[in-house]
Amino acid sequence: MSMITTHQNGGTITVMLAARAINPLSRLFQRELGALIDKLEAQRTQLHGVIIGFHSEAADADHELEHLMALTTAQAGDCMHMLGAYNGLLRRLETLGIPVIATLGGPVTGHALGLALACHRRISLEEAGFSLPQVHLGMTPVAGEIARAARLAGLQAAMPLLLEGATLSAGQALKAGLLHAVAGDEQHMAELVHHALEADMPALQPWDAKAWRLPGGELDSAPVLALLQVAPAMLRERTGGHAPAPEAILCAMVEGLQVDFDTALLIESRYFCQTAISPVARNLMRLSQIRCDLASPAAAAFASTLRQAYAGETDALRADGVSESLLRNAARAAGLPPPPAAGPGAAAPSADAAAPAPTFDDIRDRLLYALANATHAAVDAGDVDSDEADLVSVRLCGFPAHTGGAAHFVEHVGKDSFAKRSAALKMAPFSL
């Protein structure tokens, strides 16, 4: 089945794209998109408008993630080449010289939204939602998604979409400057498209116009400078320094707004390749592919076991004289949730002055290793398999997602290293 279909009515061509197939790193999709743009360029003098819509069937996200998870550092050059070719196709679309209008309905996510941003006008239905969720998978958006969103909305208004992976309603997207109009129904949308074409709308992106100014203030304006002074610290506070993607996105936004558009695309591609091949992205992508019923009795029982292990270790640390503030800081450094309150039967702090106080690193590792050891005990007992254990530990118990989960944490550290560190912490590891 073709990923792109066209229908011509006089001087207007309507293009329908399979949203699930839009992939900047797919040679097959690039060939079809390139053939479409070749056709549009060849007929340019006979056309007065292009309307692009999207089939919004569920995307086969797992297939794309498997491809991304296979990326290695050695393939970074090939990745940059593919992205450069795709960026070139979108630039040809937005410099076509005739109006290109995107009509949007339902969920418009990821690369489908990225392609829509390369159109000169975007009109959506009221129920549509818009998101660039790549940050949740440890990656930066790519293929102009950062450069275009930041230039259309301005630095601050684009942050929820880019840095948080938030889903914007049609009204929010309109207010942010990502849409030009919102229609109540399909008929209303058709009327808005017709009026836009009849009004001889400019076939030009704002940043390609000489008089373009960044919405919300230039980078050297007082409000934006104030925002940039606190934004990095706010990101680190939110992520604990464990998620490189949000900081990479912010860097791509700011650096890209200081240069011409084509250079901004290159900067964005570099940050994507850097984050996509990172262990954090690989772990987050793997977690997203695990299928597990988190509401099942087995998942609930395992989660309860982990919570008890966490509470037990925090009580043991309190008994070793570790203060509440130090416990909280160590848990945060590990990427774990705040320690639970002391249990009713918790031992009082030790009065043995000769016993050395645990170091900060030891406290952090004891919290992590307590959960990892309890996880492997449950896996060994057949209570849960390792994939389910990883997902439950992250989603229900707050084990740091960047590690890939409590079972995967041991694989990452290495079984021998894990056993040695457990021994150094005086924590007897379960059978590995």
Report residues per predicted region.
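Gly/Pro- and small hydrophobic-enriched strand-loop and loop-to-helix capping segments
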Residues: 120-142, 179-193
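Glycine-rich beta-to-alpha active-site loop
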Residues: 87, 91-137
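Substrate-binding/catalytic subdomain of NAD(P)-dependent oxidoreductase enzymes
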Residues: 179, 246, 252-254, 259-277, ...
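Glycine- (often His-adjacent) and acidic-residue-rich active-site loop
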Residues: 46, 54-85, 136-139
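Amphipathic alpha-helical segments at domain termini/boundaries
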Residues: 1-16, 114-118, 160-271, 284-299, ...
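Conserved CoA-thioester-binding segment of acyl-CoA-metabolizing enzymes
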Residues: 1-53, 77
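Hydrophobic, secondary-structure "cap" segments at the distal end of domains
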Residues: 145-156
